[in-house]
């Protein structure tokens, strides 16, 4: 089978599936063109085989139709139809990152947004360094002199 014949059979099968098929079968017979259904591997032949056999394997039993990631220009009525739908999970993540609660408690941005000094950590009664996000190394521990510690203790 030639490449041109294969392409014609695929195009005709696609038109039939969409319901746009307008060619006359008798005209095809007069021209000497084989009908697409006579080709052994035509889309029409595979449609008939898949509908007749009830045992389908893999994703094919769950997935029917085309991917929703792409829209054909012929089916789009407005520009909004061409836009990819937003994933609700990504929208929620974006909303969380932009919330003021996230910035205030720095649960999303890490310790760098808090700008805590060693004195703030010591006065808060927390002897552990602030938790860092990402792959940054922990802050270097600063040694406090005895005079500095006694001055801090007398303030509280």
Curated annotation (Swiss-Prot):
Which protein, by its recorded name, is this?
Protein OXIDATIVE STRESS 3 LIKE 3
Keyword entries, A-Z: Nucleus, Stress response
| Top-level lineage group | Eukaryota
Tell me, in one coarse class, where this protein mainly resides: nucleus
GO biological process per UniProt: response to oxidative stress
Q: Where in the cell is it found?
A: Nucleus
Instruction: Return the GO cellular component terms, semicolon-separated.
Output: nucleus
Q: What is the lineage of its organism?
A: Eukaryota, Viridiplantae, Streptophyta, Embryophyta, Tracheophyta
Residue ranges of the region described as Disordered: 1-67
Here the segments flagged for biased composition (Basic and acidic residues) are 13-26
Biological function:
Promotes slightly the tolerance to oxidizing chemicals (e.g. diamide).
Among InterPro entries, the record links this protein to:
OxStress_Response_Reg
């Amino acid at each position: 089978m030639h490449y041109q014949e294969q392409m014609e059979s695929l195009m005709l099968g696609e038109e039939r599936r969409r319901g746009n098929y307008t060619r006359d079968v008798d005209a095809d017979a007069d021209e000497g063109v084989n009908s697409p259904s006579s080709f052994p591997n035509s889309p029409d032949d595979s449609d008939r085989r898949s509908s007749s056999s009830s045992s389908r394997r893999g994703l094919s039993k769950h997935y029917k139709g085309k991917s929703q990631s792409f829209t054909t220009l012929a089916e789009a009525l407005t520009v909004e139809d061409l836009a990819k739908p937003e994933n609700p999970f990504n929208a929620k993540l974006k909303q969380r990152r932009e919330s003021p609660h996230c910035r205030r408690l720095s649960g999303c941005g890490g310790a760098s947004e808090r700008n805590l000094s060693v004195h703030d950590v010591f006065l808060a009664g927390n002897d552990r360094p602030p938790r860092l996000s990402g792959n940054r190394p922990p802050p270097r521990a600063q040694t406090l002199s005895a005079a500095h510690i006694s001055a801090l203790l007398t303030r509280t």
